[in-house]
Amino acid sequence: MVQVDLITGFLGSGKTTFMRHYARYMVQQGWNVCILENDFGAVNVDVMLLQDILGDHCDMESISGGCDCDTHQRRLRTKLISLAMQGFDRVIIEPSGIFDVDEFFDILHDEPLDKWYRMGNVIAIVDAKQEQQLSPQSAYLLASETANAGMVVLSRSQLATPAEMDSTVNYLNHALEQNGCARRFGADVLRKNWENLTPQDLAAVAACGSKQASYEKMHFDQHDVFSSLYFIDRHLPLPRLKEVVNELFADASCGRIMRIKGFTSDGNGWLELNASRDAMTLKPIAKAQEVIIVIGEQLNRAAIEAHWKEV
């Protein structure tokens, strides 16, 4: 049977970046891997981030977005039926923005998927310096995306102190408690710089499994809480782009911005931008498109647009 692994987490938490490490490890084990991602955006950023691992043993498929959850789930079922015929050993899915993880378990038990697939690992990605002043809806999403995880993997741990990582885990456990979930995390949290992950680290993640956990359901449209705004081909000089990023985080009228990411050029090549309120990184990438994505709660496009004007 084909094993399905889920990688969950907030928008901008680092799920796609972790997929690069995880999928590469699987290919090195001799498995044929398919990454199934959600094509919600105006630009397929995931393809850009994953381009260096795609090849004979690692493929990517997408499910078109822009529809209601029921339609999206039907499309997912259809896609999984198609993938079952293509000889993959592992399928990695990023399900957030579609439905709760426990609802995905139900899909895998539907015929004929139950004959071809088995549930593998649920891996939750959480920022090591997780924002802790979340709305009740966002705290619920944090709890629901981690409750069934076999392991939590902290992103950007190299930028956090041990005390900050402890605080993040404590806040995660508090969010679980507040949403009626008995699950708690401790030793099952990976707190390591992803660039230093060993085969043993990734083997532990690949064997983490999933947990059965219940929590009180909160019904709302996730897109009303978290949203992402795309700004394409703005062509700001790099020094000005850095200024704009800092301005956006400081301007409360823009909404509650949690992450800014995307791609830009410095004249010599492409750079991948990843910024939070307290840190900004720019790393070379082989090929990309000029796009900046602003992620957060109650975003104000007009206020954000005003900052893009070059001065």
Residue ranges: model-predicted function:
Residues 42, 148-154, 159-288, 299-302, ...:
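C-terminal accessory "lid"/substrate-recognition subdomains
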Residues 51-52, 114-115, 143-144, 220, ...:
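Short secondary-structure boundary/capping segments
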Residues 86, 90-191:
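Phosphate/Mg2+-binding loops and adjacent switch elements
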Residues 290-296:
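Short, well-ordered beta-strand elements
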